Amino acid sequence: MILRFKDTSGVVLFTLPNPSELEVPGPEQPITIYGKKYYTHKMTREYFDNKISTVKTSSDCYYDITVLTEKQYDELFQRGPSMPGSE
C-alpha cells in the first residue's frame, strides 16, 4: 500500500510507501507536510497494475488522502448562524 497525500486540485504533496498502521491518519486529523499544516478530508483507493498477478491486493493500491489547508478546513466546517426556530 502506498499513501498519497493530495491537495484539492489533485496534486500529490507527499507519498508514503508501506506505512505502518500508526502512520495512517484518521479523518479530519491535522497533519504537517513539509512544515505546512493540513487536515485530512477524504480517502479513496486506487489499484495499480501489478504485472505479476491478476489478483488485486491491498499492497497493489494507492490510498489517496485529500487534505485541506487550514483556511479550506475552517471554511468547510465553520458554524453558520442557527436556523430560525431551532433554539
Swiss-Prot record:
Name of the protein in question: Uncharacterized 10.1 kDa protein in nrdA-td intergenic region
A Pfam family it matches: DUF5496
Gene: y14B
InterPro entries: DUF5496
Domain of life: Viruses
Species of provenance: Enterobacteria phage T4
